[in-house]
Amino acid sequence: MPEGPEIRRAADNLEAAIKGKPLTDVWFAFAQLKPYESQLTGQLVTRIETRGKALLTHFSNGLTLYSHNQLYGVWRVIDTGEIPQTTRILRVRLQTADKTILLYSASDIEMLTAEQLTTHPFLQRVGPDVLDARLTPEEVKARLLSPRFRNRQFSGLLLDQAFLAGLGNYLRVEILWQVGLTGQHKAKDLNEAQLNALSHALLDIPRLSYTTRGQSDENKHHGALFRFKVFHRDGEACERCGGIIEKTTLSSRPFYWCPHCQK
C-alpha cells in the first residue's frame, strides 16, 4: 500500500491538473453520490488535502470528497476526451476543459459537509500527519511519551495511523534503521538522546521521501524515490557498519534491519 509521501505526491499531481478550474462534468459510480454530480458541475476544486492515506478533495461550494485508496484504489490524470485503456473499474470522474482526474477501484468514497468532516470516524481516529509542516519534533516527542503510546512497541506503533498518519512499513523500517533501534523498543525505555533522534527521524524520513526524487533503482517501492538503506535489502551489507541486513516479520509485516548496529 502506498504510504504518506506517495499519497501526497499523487495529490500534488491531481491539484496541478484541475485545481482552480471549473468542473465541466462530474460522474460518480455509486448511487448515493449521484445527486452531487449536478451540484459540483461548474464548481472549482480549491485544494486536495491528505490525511495520512486518505484524500480530501475540497470544492468551492463547501463540499469535500473523501476517498481512501486502501489496497487497490488509484487516481489517474488524463487529457479531457482521452479514453484510458484499463481493466480497472471507474469510481469517480472530475473533468475540466483540458484535464480530467479519475479514481479507479476504490470503494471507500463519501461526500462530506464541513460539519461532517469534523465527525468522520477515520478522520477523528487518525493522528497528526507527518507531512504537515506545522508538526514539530517536540510535538512528536510528547506524543511518543503520552500514556496512550509510551508502552507500545515500535514494531506496531509505527504502523498505527492513530499515532502518526502517513507512516507505513517502508518508513517504519527506514526510521528505525536511521536511529539504530529495533522494533521491540518502547518510548518509555529510551534515553533523552534516543527520544530526540527518533522524534526528528519520524518527520525527517517521510519528508525526505516526499521532497526528493533520489536514485530510481531497485531500492524504490510504491513510488518512494529516495534510496532505501535497509528496506528490501536483506543479504546486503549495511552501509553504516558493514553488517548483513536481515529480514524477519514484525506485526505481521516484513521487517528489514541490521542486527549489528540496531540494538
Curated annotation (Swiss-Prot):
GO terms for biological process: base-excision repair. GO terms for molecular function: class I DNA-(apurinic or apyrimidinic site) endonuclease activity; damaged DNA binding; oxidized pyrimidine nucleobase lesion DNA N-glycosylase activity; zinc ion binding. DNA binds at residues 70, 125, 169. A zinc finger (FPG-type) spans 229-263. Keywords: DNA damage, DNA repair, DNA-binding, Glycosidase, Hydrolase, Lyase, Metal-binding, Multifunctional enzyme, Zinc, Zinc-finger. It catalyses: 2'-deoxyribonucleotide-(2'-deoxyribose 5'-phosphate)-2'-deoxyribonucleotide-DNA = a 3'-end 2'-deoxyribonucleotide-(2,3-dehydro-2,3-deoxyribose 5'-phosphate)-DNA + a 5'-end 5'-phospho-2'-deoxyribonucleoside-DNA + H(+). The keyword Cell cycle does not apply. The keyword DNA-binding applies. It comes from the Bacteria. Its EC number is 3.2.2.-, 4.2.99.18. CDD domains: EcNei-like_N. Belongs to the FPG family. This is Endonuclease 8. It comes from Salmonella enteritidis PT4 (strain P125109).
